[in-house]
Regions:
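Hydrophobic membrane-insertion alpha-helices, especially the h-region
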Residues: 27-42
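Soluble "head" domains of membrane/secretory-pathway proteins
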Residues: 2-22, 38, 47-48, 56-208
């Protein structure tokens, strides 16, 4: 009888230990899920590039990490790559900040003017030079290629908004078409390319 009692007690102890371990695993998984949710909701989130509008700097299929907290601390700046919601199309766009509140924007062909000062754009310099070498404009002529245009004639960026352009000026639906992007629509700044692995890098944000 004592031996049976001891064996029974030992078995109960093992079951109790296994139960406690399962509970701990469940707790850890729940905490992990909650942390992932909070991080994605408030701090960082993934984004997949879809389309040619940011070529030559970003390609379709590249996966980025978007910093969602930075613009809660400060306002967007010229040259930063941002992801924002486009409610009318129920999707997100990735573009580059060109104008901030108070800036007057003018785009004529490949010449960008901010507050009537011509601005160099190093992030597309080589692409512009390659087009010019072939006797072409990088920003093809068209009804909505320049700014202002018939779709959007207001040149000065209002408070609580930004003016954003795609790097691929020939093929980009951006503020020339959809107008200014409000602060509420901005998701965050694209900070890291994490896929494919051979392109893993921090994204460079240019300044004037």
């Amino acid at each position: 009888m004592p031996n049976r009692a001891a064996a029974h007690a030992s078995g109960s102890g093992k079951q109790s230990g296994a139960y406690k371990e399962i509970v701990e695993w469940i707790k850890a998984l729940v905490i992990a899920v909650v942390l992932v949710f909070l991080i994605r909701q408030f701090l960082f989130s993934p984004f997949i590039v879809d389309g040619p509008s940011m070529q030559p700097n970003f390609e379709t299929g590249e996966r980025l990490i978007v910093n969602k907290i930075i613009y809660a601390i400060r306002e967007p700046k010229f040259g930063e790559v941002v992801v924002f919601d486009v409610p009318e199309q129920d999707r997100k766009f990735i573009k580059r900040v060109i104008g901030v509140p108070g800036d007057t924007i003018r785009l004529e062909g490949d010449d960008l003017y901010i507050n009537e000062k011509k601005i160099d754009e190093p992030y597309i310099k080589e692409a512009i030079e390659a087009a010019h070498a072939k006797g072409e404009l990088y920003n093809l002529a068209g009804p909505d290629s320049n700014f202002p245009n018939s779709s959007n004639q207001e040149m000065t960026v209002p408070e609580g908004a930004i003016f954003a352009l795609g790097d691929n000026r020939r093929n980009s639906s951006d503020s020339r078409v959809i107008g200014f992007v409000t602060d509420d629509e901005v998701v965050g700044r694209a900070d890291i390319i994490f896929w494919p692995l051979n392109k893993l890098e921090f994204i460079k944000h240019w300044t004037k």
